[in-house]
């Protein structure tokens, strides 16, 4: 992802953080998403119990990692997820083409690659594959490592310290789970399962 960030900078002729701000965050009205937290918003920052002393930048860092480092809110995440659920468009604002979204949410792992360990977890890709930056669920019967339960075609990805999101186009559903610190797998799976149980057939 960091290499992709450099390529974006060169193609766009602007810093990666500025590209995200002008091409994605501002058009989607994501007012609280950036690689830093301004001083006047620090009181709203949730600090993880596993790393309470972590330094949080108050301005754009000199080195940006495209692989991570954004701070955001549930409301902003929802705007982004609504755009993805809208096949690249939110209301009258198009961010990516529907064809690009189809590429993004297709699996590109071979059966052999899916058998490999990932993050030290065996069968990490059991029941799901990997697209362009997102996990993609393809087996309804498997409670898969990243996506958990969900319809085939559900896609999303976890973040640091417990953030997790998913878009299920088949059920027209967005799930956003935000906690800070600790192991979130059990409560996140319970959150998911109850959401699906609430859907009337």
Regions found by a protein language model. Give the residues of each.
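Short, surface-exposed loop or secondary-structure junction motifs
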Residues: 1-152
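Short acidic, gly/pro-rich beta-turn/loop elements at beta-sheet edges
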Residues: 114, 144, 177, 186-187
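Short, small/polar residue-rich loop motifs at catalytic or cofactor-binding pockets
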Residues: 159-161
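Generic C-terminus detector
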Residues: 179-201
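A generic secondary-structure signal marking the coil-to-beta-strand transition
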Residues: 130-132, 153, 163, 171-173
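Short, well-ordered beta-strand elements
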Residues: 165-167, 171-181
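Short, structured beta-strand/loop micro-motifs enriched in basic residues and often containing a Trp
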Residues: 156
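Hydrophobic alpha-helical segments
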Residues: 2, 78, 169, 189-192
